[in-house]
Each structure stands twice: as structure tokens, then as C-alpha cells.
């Protein structure tokens, strides 16, 4: 039976401000990328989300970011390697403490937003993130954009990696994510998205924004928790996968 991981960005609420529906998403996904306080999330909310993930058997990952709450971590920063290494260590360390208190462990790291996009092709910042992960826990898996150079860089440094595709994002013919600033970059039709993800899981291909077919080898699929209709999209993907005999299972289950 074909199997693939389904992940979502969670724990991003802050105080009275609510982002997404963590409880609903945790009933659907197999892995949860938990905010670590740098782009979103407060201690009580992060703890609550990690506890809920542990109770549901969902694997927990550290969703590390640039220090940018105002910009929700979506603004690019020219951080030095020293700063970035320390930021990564700090965030993973914080989530490890929360996870221990909640009776679970942090199994992987997925950078967020601008940091995720930057390190996909920026070797200097990518190496800093890798060095930060290795400094605190070299057993952690790095999740990154499928087909991006960061995955090879991490492998060469001795880290295990997982390639990720995005359910609700359009792709360029080169296999990169279409910028959110461009029309059609974010997808909203749950049925069409689910059909695309079945194609990805079965054939390892997707239709790019220009209609061409591109190769995407991914072991995990992300549904952004803050996207409009995120829960409905995730539910439809899960329904289609179950109907087509595709198992939803965290990549960490095999490690």
C-alpha cells in the first residue's frame, strides 16, 4: 500500500489572537509542525497544542523561524550564521522542553515561511540551520522543499531529510513554489487539491501553473493551517487517500 505523511503548521495562535483550528487538524494529519514562539505561538498555546498532538499520536516537529512575530515570519532577514545557529538551537530547545512536559518528543525540524524559502537555495543560511540542528540533536530529521538543494546539503552534513510538497500551493515549471504575490499561487478548491495529491502520492508528479507536468518526489504533504478552508482541504485529501488505498503515516514512524 502506498503511504505518505500529511503535515500542518500548528500552535500559531497568540494570546487572544487565534490562528487556524489545531484541534480539527490534529484529527487529520500525521505530523504537526509546532510554532516555537519566534513567528507565532505563546507558551500556553504551544503547550496545549503539543499535549493534544501527543494524545492523538501525532508526531511533533519544531517549526523554527526568523524572529519576526509582526511579519509572521514571512519577511526575509539577512541573519548572520552565528545568529541563525543560536536561533535554531533556542527554538528547538524550547519545544523539546514543552514536548517532554507533554509526554512526547520532537522528531524533526521544519523551517517556517521566509526562512524555509531562503534556505531552499541559500547554502550559507541553510548550513547555519543544519549546524543549529546538529548542535542540539543530530538525530532530528530536516523537512525541506522537494527538489531543493538544501536536502542534499543536509544529507552531506549527516542529517536525515524528508522532502515536502504543498497541497495548497501552485508550482512553477522548475518545481519551485509560485510566489504568494502572484495570482493563482494559493489553491482553494478542495476536490481539485485532493486530486492533485493523489497524483503526487501515486505518480510523483504534479501539474505546474503553466500546465506542464513536473516530477516531485515527496514523502510529506503540507496543508497550511492558516489557509482559508484548511480543515476542509485536509479532510478531503484524507478522504480521497483512504478511498484510493493510500495510507497516511508519519515519516517518523519508520525511524
UniProtKB/Swiss-Prot annotation:
Q: Name one GO molecular function term.
A: ATP binding
Q: Which UniProt keywords apply?
A: ATP-binding, Hydrolase, Nucleotide-binding
Which GO BP terms sit in this record? carbohydrate metabolic process
Its EC number is: 3.5.2.9
The record lists the catalysed reaction(s) as: 5-oxo-L-proline + ATP + 2 H2O = L-glutamate + ADP + phosphate + H(+)
Keyword set includes Membrane: no
Give the matching SUPFAM superfamilies.
Glycoside hydrolase/deacetylase
Protein role: Catalyzes the cleavage of 5-oxoproline to form L-glutamate coupled to the hydrolysis of ATP to ADP and inorganic phosphate.
Which HAMAP family does the record cross-reference, listed alphabetically?
Answer: PxpA (MF_00691)
What is the similarity comment for this entry?
Belongs to the LamB/PxpA family.
Describe the subunit structure.
Forms a complex composed of PxpA, PxpB and PxpC.
Query: What is the name listed in the Swiss-Prot or TrEMBL entry for this protein?
Result: 5-oxoprolinase subunit A 1
User: What is the species of this protein?
Assistant: Agrobacterium fabrum (strain C58 / ATCC 33970)
Amino acid at each position: 500500500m502506498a503511504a505518505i505523511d500529511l503535515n500542518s503548521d500548528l500552535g500559531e495562535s497568540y494570546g487572544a489572537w487565534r490562528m487556524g483550528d489545531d484541534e480539527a487538524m490534529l484529527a487529520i494529519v500525521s505530523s504537526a509542525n509546532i510554532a516555537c514562539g519566534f513567528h507565532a505561538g505563546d507558551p500556553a498555546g504551544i503547550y496545549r497544542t503539543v499535549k493534544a498532538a501527543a494524545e492523538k499520536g501525532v508526531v511533533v516537529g519544531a517549526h523554527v523561524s526568523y524572529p519576526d512575530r509582526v511579519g509572521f515570519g514571512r519577511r526575509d532577514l539577512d541573519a548572520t550564521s552565528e545568529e541563525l545557529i543560536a536561533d535554531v538551537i533556542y527554538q528547538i530547545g524550547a519545544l523539546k522542553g514543552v514536548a517532554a512536559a507533554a509526554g512526547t518528543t520532537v522528531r524533526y525540524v521544519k523551517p517556517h515561511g521566509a526562512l524555509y524559502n531562503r534556505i531552499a537555495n541559500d547554502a550559507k543560511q541553510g548550513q547555519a540551520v543544519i549546524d543549529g540542528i546538529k548542535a542540539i540533536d543530530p538525530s532530528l530529521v530536516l523537512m525541506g522543499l522537494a527538489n531543493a538543494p538544501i536536502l542534499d546539503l543536509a544529507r552531506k552534513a549527516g542529517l536525515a531529510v524528508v522532502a515536502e510538497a504543498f497541497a495548497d500551493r501552485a508550482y512553477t515549471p522548475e518545481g519551485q513554489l509560485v510566489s504568494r504575490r502572484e495570482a493563482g499561487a494559493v489553491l482553494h478548491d478542495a476536490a481539485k487539491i485532493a486530486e492533485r495529491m493523489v497524483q503526487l502520492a501515486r505518480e510523483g508528479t504534479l501539474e505546474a501553473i503553466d500546465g506542464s507536468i513536473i516530477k516531485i518526489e515527496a514523502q510529506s504533504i503540507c496543508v497550511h493551517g492558516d489557509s482559508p478552508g484548511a480543515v476542509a482541504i485536509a479532510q478531503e485529501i484524507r478522504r480521497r487517500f483512504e478511498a484510493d488505498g493510500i495510507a497516511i503515516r508519519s515519516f517518523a514512524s519508520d525511524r
